[in-house]
């Protein structure tokens, strides 16, 4: 027991190494750009002030989104998806697997659940003792079930899911903008140092490496950001792209794809003026999502999006009522 605790403690400590590396590179880039480029290399005051203003806007947005991606805790299923004491006792004492499955089916009929395991059974997490909502998965690193889990990202040392997916996307976008701005403004001075128009000194080293590091990070981020833009457009998570969710008629990668406009609003919210600001605006509460396979008139979550507001009582009641009838439809 003591050994396992020590190993988990070491794992938690080492898991911060990628974040420390990124933070160190960013802090160095701040010093190199502000002091070595703007204050040491640049001679034009107007150019210096302009570069500093734009740079600090990019730097603040990068830090803000990175902070939110790291420290926003992953959302977990609410109590209504956990087994009650009576159901848990009945489930654990039952030795017949087919009866255990039926117990979970009976409980799930009261919940807005449409997806199943590959075998067709109710998706149940033995570790968390919870019936998994649609798009929810257990993270072995965080040791909990995460709503609309996309992946566990070592570079933010956090699970990317429903609660912080918008922040993660903004982090990628502002990281690219940060790199592009640095590379585009440093390039002319890189050439001047390279051909010898500017004298050698500490600034030369920083300016040369600023360009290389900015370009290297931009290229890697460009592919990752492009991939996640495609996922958002299709309303898929990374896990769903590799293993499509299973519905009544089998696996369907486009099961949650309700159109580009609605897909974007699910992640970024209704108000476009808040799309590029790292504040939580995603629709719903992460437990249930509109389905493409149901007509809009039959899908209460798609036809009545105003019910997605975080109103615990009314939201749960409508979900219970609609979830039960719709679940029977998918199992028929």
Swiss-Prot record:
Ranges where the DHHC domain occurs: 123-173
A GO CC term assigned to this protein in UniProt: Golgi membrane
Catalytic activity annotation: L-cysteinyl-[protein] + hexadecanoyl-CoA = S-hexadecanoyl-L-cysteinyl-[protein] + CoA; L-cysteinyl-[protein] + tetradecanoyl-CoA = S-tetradecanoyl-L-cysteinyl-[protein] + CoA; L-cysteinyl-[protein] + octadecanoyl-CoA = S-octadecanoyl-L-cysteinyl-[protein] + CoA
Alphabetical GO biological process terms: peptidyl-L-cysteine S-palmitoylation; protein localization to membrane; protein targeting to Golgi apparatus
Keyword presence, Acetylation: no
PTM annotation: Autopalmitoylated (in vitro).
EC supergroup of this enzyme: transferase
EC number: 2.3.1.225, 2.3.1.-
Transmembrane helix among keywords: yes
Record region (Disordered): 305-332
Binding residues for Zn(2+) 1: 125, 128, 138, 145
UniProt similarity note: Belongs to the DHHC palmitoyltransferase family.
Protein name as it appears in the record: Palmitoyltransferase ZDHHC15B
């Amino acid at each position: 027991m003591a050994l396992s605790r020590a190993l988990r403690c070491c794992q938690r400590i080492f898991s911060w190494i990628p974040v420390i590396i990124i933070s160190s590179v960013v802090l160095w880039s701040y010093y190199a750009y502000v002091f070595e480029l703007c204050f040491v290399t640049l001679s034009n005051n107007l150019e210096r002030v302009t570069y500093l203003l734009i740079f600090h806007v990019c730097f603040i947005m990068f830090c803000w989104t990175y902070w939110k991606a790291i420290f926003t805790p992953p959302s977990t299923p609410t109590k209504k998806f956990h087994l009650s004491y009576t159901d848990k006792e009945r489930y654990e004492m039952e030795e017949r697997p087919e009866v255990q499955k039926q117990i979970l089916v009976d409980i799930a009929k009261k919940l807005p659940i449409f997806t199943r395991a590959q075998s067709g059974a109710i998706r149940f997490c033995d570790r968390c003792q919870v019936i998994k909502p649609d798009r929810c998965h257990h993270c072995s690193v965080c040791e909990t079930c995460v709503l609309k889990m996309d992946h566990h990202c070592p570079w933010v040392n956090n699970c990317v899911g429903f609660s912080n997916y918008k922040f993660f996307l903004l982090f990628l976008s502002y990281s690219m903008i940060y790199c592009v701005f640095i590379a585009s403004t440093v390039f002319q001075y890189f050439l001047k140092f390279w051909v010898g128009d500017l004298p050698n000194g500490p600034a030369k080293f920083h300016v040369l490496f600023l360009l290389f590091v900015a370009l290297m990070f931009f290229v890697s981020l460009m592919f990752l950001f492009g991939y996640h833009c495609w996922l958002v457009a299709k309303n898929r998570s990374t896990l769903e792209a590799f293993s499509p969710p299973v519905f009544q008629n089998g696996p369907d990668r486009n099961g949650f794809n309700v159109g580009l406009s609605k897909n974007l609003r699910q992640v970024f919210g209704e108000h476009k003026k808040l799309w590029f600001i790292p504040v939580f605006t995603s629709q719903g509460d992460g437990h249930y999502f509109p389905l493409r396979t149901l007509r809009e008139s039959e899908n209460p979550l798609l036809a009545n999006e105003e019910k997605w507001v975080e109103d615990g009582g009314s939201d749960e009641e409508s979900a219970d009522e609609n979830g039960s009838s719709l679940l029977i439809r998918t199992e028929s």
